[in-house]
A protein has these predicted regions:
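Walker A/P-loop-proximal flanking segment of P-loop NTPase domains
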Residues: 1-41, 47-56
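P-loop NTPase nucleotide-binding core
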Residues: 33-146, 152-156, 161, 185, ...
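Sensor-1/coupling segment of RecA-like P-loop NTPase cores
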Residues: 154-203, 216
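Conserved small helical "lid"/interfacial subdomain of P-loop NTPases
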Residues: 216-244, 251
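Winged-helix-like regulatory helical subdomains adjacent to P-loop NTPase cores
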Residues: 248-250, 254-342
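Short amphipathic alpha-helical interaction segments
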Residues: 337-357
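Accessory beta->alpha helical hairpin/"wing" motif in late/C-terminal subdomains of nucleic-acid enzymes
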Residues: 363-377
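Short, amphipathic alpha-helical interaction segments positioned at domain boundaries
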Residues: 374-388
Length: 388
């Protein structure tokens, strides 16, 4: 594992994903319909995409375009994607550019690529469409083109974003349905809003319906070991054992920033306390986990007593999902808690609002889960204490 740049690299995971995208087996050809990768916030998704997956895809000869829809909130999703595509095409046109050098084996000459359209016209009302641009790019470069759109759910909810998704779907179809195509167009959308990400691949009204959905693999114990090793050379540092640090990392939702924060607090506390690190560290982690979850848990209170009752029913059910939120038994339980009659439309309205707030998710028809397993665990732990 390379630690020279202070980044924990997940080479194996990246190489496996890259191979599945670019060299799918006959049973996994559906990746060419699009892939949607979901994972909770602050678990290292973006770092993995930019520092591991992109290089792994490029190592297999792909041309990769990465766009983060949270990079500039003042710009629309369509503007950000078009800007990234234009920039990539411009680099391919520019003699001596680093990107062009990667494809020097194509014998393009000193002038680089020459496209049959003006870059400024890309995406304009009467100009070149993304489908036309990507089709020409694949035909001339004869490579797989991978477009990664981070926080892709930002494209939902606006006419501009919806038009963008339909344009990308058209690009996928234009390239991948071409007989004997020398390369494919692969679309990878990632995001932290699990329910919306799932909807983008399963709802009939969505352009990428039928695409593959998968969960981001959170960091494991090897990351914890790497983090401990990285700071172990600091003079006078106090560290917990790997097992204790791993347990704390899990408690804090597999969030790298929280692990480092806990280790920093351990140093501060050890200066004024004789408590062994393996005893102090779990307390620090539990406190940080509780504080981090408070933001989400306070948001639940904003949905009133009925909203809290609905959330409780979901949280107390199976981690894989709860159904029957609108059934007679559930409605009776809500009524008992709120002291008034509850009708299915009220429950549906609140459930939809909590989905929009990313508090709960809908992984399947009529099935609901807590969006963040970390928040669910903190909620359950607190309610167990209240029942004692």
């Amino acid at each position: 594992m390379n630690t020279s740049d202070q980044i924990f690299h997940r080479k194996t995971y990246a190489e496996q994903m890259a191979q599945q995208l670019l060299q799918p087996s006959p049973l996994h050809m559906n990746v060419r319909s699009g892939v949607f990768l979901s994972g909770i916030r602050r678990v290292g998704k973006t770092t993995f995409l930019r520092r591991d997956l992109v290089p792994a895809l490029e190592a297999l000869g792909a041309l990769v375009i990465y766009v983060d829809l949270w990079a500039d909130r003042s710009k629309s999703p369509a503007a950000l994607v078009l800007e990234a595509v234009r920039n990539t095409l411009l680099q391919l046109q520019t003699p001596g550019s680093g990107l062009l050098q990667r494809f020097k084996g194509l014998n393009l000459g000193a002038a680089g690529f020459s496209f049959g359209f003006q870059l400024d016209s890309l995406g304009t009302t009467s100009g070149t469409t993304l489908a036309q641009a990507f089709a020409e790019l694949v035909a001339k470069a004869q490579v797989n083109v991978v477009l990664i759109v981070d926080e892709v759910q930002q494209a939902l909810g606006s006419e501009d974003g919806n038009s963008l998704l339909h344009a990308l779907k058209a690009a996928r179809d234009a390239v991948n349905s071409q007989p004997g195509t020398p390369g494919h167009f692969l679309f990878l959308g990632t995001g932290s809003h699990k329910s919306l990400i799932t909807d983008m691949a399963t709802r009939r009204a969505q352009p990428f319906t039928g695409a593959l959905t998968t969960a981001y693999q959170v960091l494991e114990q090897d990351f914890v070991q790497w983090q401990l090793d990285a700071i172990a050379t600091t003079p006078g540092v106090v560290l917990p054992s790997v097992a204790v640090a791993w347990a704390g990392f899990q408690l804090m939702g597999h969030r790298p920033e929280e692990l480092l924060k806990a280790l920093v607090q351990l140093q501060t506390g050890s200066a004024s306390s004789s408590t062994p690190a393996d005893q102090a560290f779990p307390i620090i982690c539990a406190t940080l986990a509780s504080v981090a979850a408070d933001v989400e848990l306070r948001a639940i209170e904003e949905f009133g007593e009925l909203g809290q009752a609905i959330f409780a029913r979901i949280a107390e059910g199976s981690e894989s999902g709860v159904s029957g939120l609108f059934g007679e038994e559930a409605l009776a339980a809500y009524a008992e808690r709120t002291g008034s009659q509850v009708l299915p439309p009220q429950v549906q309205n609140l459930a939809d609002r909590m989905i929009s707030a990313n508090l709960i998710a809908r992984p399947g028809h009529g099935v609901y889960t807590v969006a963040d397993p970390f928040v669910r665990k903190v909620w359950l732990d607190r309610h167990k204490l209240l029942k004692l």
